[in-house]
Design a protein with these regions (language model features):
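Juxtamembrane transmembrane-helix termini in multi-pass membrane transport proteins
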Residues: 1-70, 128-148
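Alpha-helical transmembrane segments and their lipid-water interface positions
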Residues: 46-58, 80-86, 115, 123, ...
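Selective transmembrane alpha-helices of multi-pass membrane proteins
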Residues: 64-92, 156-163, 171-180
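Multi-pass membrane proteins that catalyze or facilitate reactions on polyprenyl-/lipid-phosphate substrates
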Residues: 88, 127-140, 162-169
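Flexible cytoplasmic inter-helical loops of multi-pass small-molecule transporters
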Residues: 89-105
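Anionic-ligand binding region
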Residues: 101-114, 119
C-alpha cells in the first residue's frame, strides 16, 4: 500500500475546485467558520457511504450497470443544480456566526452528507482511483480499504476546516473594510 501516494492524491482531489469545497467556502462566508465546519463534517460523513460501497463491492455492481450509474450521476447533477438555484435566489444576508442553532446546524450537516454522496467527482474517485491503492494479491482487502477511507475522511475534514477558517477570516476582513 502506497500510503503517501494515496494521501497526495486525496489532498489534490479535495483541493480541486468542485461543489464540496465551493459550498464550504459559501457557508463560511455567509454564516461563519462554524457553519463551514458543520457542513464539512456532513461532507466527510457522506464519505462513509463511498468507503462502504467500495469495501463491499457495490461499486463494481454500479459500474457494471450503465443505467444505474447514469441515474446516480443525474441525481447528483439535479441536486447540485437545485442547491445552486436555491443559493442564487436566496435573500442576501449579512455575515453572521452560526450561534448554536441546532436546526440550522442539522440542516447544514444533512445537506453536506447528501451532497457528498451525490457528488460525481467523489463517486468516480472511489470507483476508479481508490482501488489502485489497495495491495494486489492480499487475501482480504477490506481492512486496507477501510484504513484508506478513514485517511481520506480525516484529510478531507482537515482541509475543509482550513478552507472554512480562511473563508471566514476573509469575509470578516471584507465586512470591516468601509470601501466594500
Amino acid at each position: 500500500m502506497n500510503l503517501w501516494g494515496f494521501i497526495s492524491a486525496a489532498v489534490l482531489l479535495t483541493l480541486m475546485p468542485g461543489p464540496d469545497i465551493l459550498f464550504v467556502i459559501t457557508q463560511s462566508i455567509t454564516r461563519g467558520r462554524k457553519a463551514g465546519m458543520v457542513f464539512a463534517a456532513g461532507l466527510c460523513t457522506g464519505l462513509i457511504a463511498h468507503v462502504t460501497a467500495v469495501s463491499l463491492g457495490v461499486s463494481i455492481l454500479l459500474m457494471s450497470s450503465p443505467v444505474a450509474f447514469t441515474m446516480l450521476k443525474f441525481a447528483g447533477a439535479a441536486y447540485l443544480l437545485y442547491l445552486g438555484v436555491k443559493a442564487f435566489l436566496a435573500r442576501r444576508e449579512n455575515h453572521f456566526e452560526l450561534s448554536g442553532d441546532a436546526a440550522v446546524s442539522g440542516k447544514l450537516y444533512r445537506k453536506g452528507i447528501l451532497m457528498n454522496i451525490l457528488n460525481p467527482k467523489v463517486i468516480l474517485f472511489f470507483l476508479a482511483f481508490f482501488p489502485q491503492f489497495i495491495d494486489k494479491g492480499i487475501e482480504n482487502p477490506i481492512p486496507q480499504m477501510l484504513l484508506l477511507g478513514l485517511v481520506f475522511m480525516v484529510q478531507a475534514f482537515l482541509i475543509f476546516s482550513m478552507v472554512a477558517a480562511v473563508a471566514d477570516r476573509l469575509a470578516r476582513r471584507l465586512m470591516q473594510n468601509p470601501k466594500v
